[in-house]
């Protein structure tokens, strides 16, 4: 389903109908995809926090927030305002420079990773040819910020939390990259746009989840571990480490960790949607929709419809995965640190490597199904 370039053309044609030049119409169009991504990130965090509170309450037979707005929808905003007015404390013997730089180094790579997240054929900030490689590189920076925060706090619990975060990230980054490499091998491209386009043509049957079920499971497990969600929240296990690397943080510095965690969760869900669930692709091919409405496939109405549906489908698939992640957090026990590392090194790493080799063999044997 092509939901970007034709939408831009239709938008420009509408503006030119009001007497604007094509250059001015193009300039007006340029910030819209960026605005969509920024708004999606901010609204996504607010919605996810509200869902987290409501789903956790349901899992524990509680009501959850209900007084701050209808059904408690304003509770995330109240949480943000509370953190905003809290005192920003730096421990007396902490390294103030590293202590301040740590949360920034955690949040910035996650936000930059949104550069390569497409909501449509042209609805992304930057269609770089190495989008997947860029995301893996950026995600490798975050553990440095976590370790820096733990070390700079001059607190034994914070240091242990930072060390755990670094060990956990290294353990799960490799199988995650190998599972993504299998997708890249089938697509012959590192571009997220190309990966989604490769899954179009036959609706839901074209999705990579059917050709890469093992890779999908490995990627999702590793993504949860990278987000430090239960059962993989060892770096901030409250029963053992108080709050891990966050122990000495308060106010807006703590809010940066909080914000980065939820943005990373949404980003991971969006990437699973893009890599394995067809991205903005609708389960029904656009040709069938156009034929049912007795309209040509390049009609402006069809293009606007498919673009709108594409955005909705991308967000819907992502939030289905967010729901699963939240449910797992509140219904599963935490694993031990040795179990966490064993799962990454002894199971996920060899399985992801075998999956990559099998994918290469299937591509040679059946190029029409696994990319030629």
Swiss-Prot record:
GO terms for biological process: aerobic respiration; photosynthesis, light reaction. Keywords: Membrane, NAD, NADP, Plastoquinone, Quinone, Thylakoid, Translocase, Transmembrane, Transmembrane helix. One of its GO terms (molecular function) is oxidoreductase activity, acting on NAD(P)H, quinone or similar compound as acceptor. The chain crosses the membrane at residues 27-47, 97-117, 128-148, 176-196, 204-224, 266-286, 308-328, 347-367. PROSITE patterns: COMPLEX1_ND1_1, COMPLEX1_ND1_2. GO terms for cellular component: plasma membrane-derived thylakoid membrane. It is a multi-pass membrane protein. It holds the Pfam family NADHdh. InterPro entries: NADH_UbQ_OxRdtase_su1/FPO, NADH_UbQ_OxRdtase_su1_CS. HAMAP family: NDH1_NuoH. NCBIfam families: PRK06076.1-2 (NF004741), PRK06076.1-5 (NF004744). Belongs to the complex I subunit 1 family. This is NAD(P)H-quinone oxidoreductase subunit 1. The gene is ndhA.
């Amino acid at each position: 389903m092509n939901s970007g370039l034709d939408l831009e053309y239709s938008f420009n044609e509408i503006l030119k109908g009001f007497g604007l030049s094509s250059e001015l119409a193009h300039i007006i169009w340029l910030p819209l995809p960026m605005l969509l991504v920024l708004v999606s990130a901010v609204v996504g965090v607010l919605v996810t926090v509200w869902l987290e509170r409501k789903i956790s309450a349901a899992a524990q037979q509680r009501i959850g927030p209900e007084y701050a707005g209808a059904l408690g929808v304003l509770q995330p905003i109240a949480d943000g305002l509370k953190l905003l007015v809290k005192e920003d404390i730096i421990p007396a013997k902490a390294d103030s420079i590293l202590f301040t730089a740590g949360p920034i180094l955690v949040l910035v790579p996650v936000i930059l990773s949104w550069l390569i997240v497409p909501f449509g054929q042209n609805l992304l900030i930057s269609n770089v040819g190495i989008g997947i490689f860029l995301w893996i590189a950026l995600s490798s920076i975050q553990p440095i910020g976590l370790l820096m925060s733990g070390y700079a706090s001059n607190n034994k619990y914070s240091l242990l939390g930072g060390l755990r975060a670094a060990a956990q990230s290294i353990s799960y980054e490799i199988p995650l990259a190998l599972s993504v490499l299998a997708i890249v091998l089938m697509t012959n491209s590192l571009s997220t746009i190309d990966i989604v386009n490769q899954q179009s043509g036959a609706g839901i049957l074209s999705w990579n989840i059917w050709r890469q079920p093992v890779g999908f499971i490995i990627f999702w497990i590793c993504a949860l571990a990278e987000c430090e969600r239960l059962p993989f929240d060892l770096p901030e296990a409250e029963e053992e480490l108080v709050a891990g690397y966050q122990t000495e943080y308060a106010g807006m510095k703590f809010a940066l960790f909080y914000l980065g965690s939820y943005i990373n969760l949404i980003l991971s869900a969006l990437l699973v949607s893009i890599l394995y669930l067809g991205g903005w692709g609708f389960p029904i091919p656009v040709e069938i929709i156009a034929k049912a409405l007795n309209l040509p496939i390049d009609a402006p109405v069809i293009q606007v419809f498919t673009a709108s549906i594409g955005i909705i489908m991308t967000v819907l698939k992502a939030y289905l995965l967010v729901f699963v992640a939240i449910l797992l957090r509140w219904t599963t026990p935490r694993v031990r640190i040795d179990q966490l590392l064993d799962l990454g090194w002894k199971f996920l790493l060899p399985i992801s490597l075998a999956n990559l080799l099998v994918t290469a063999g299937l591509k040679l044997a059946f190029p029409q199904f696994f990319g030629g």
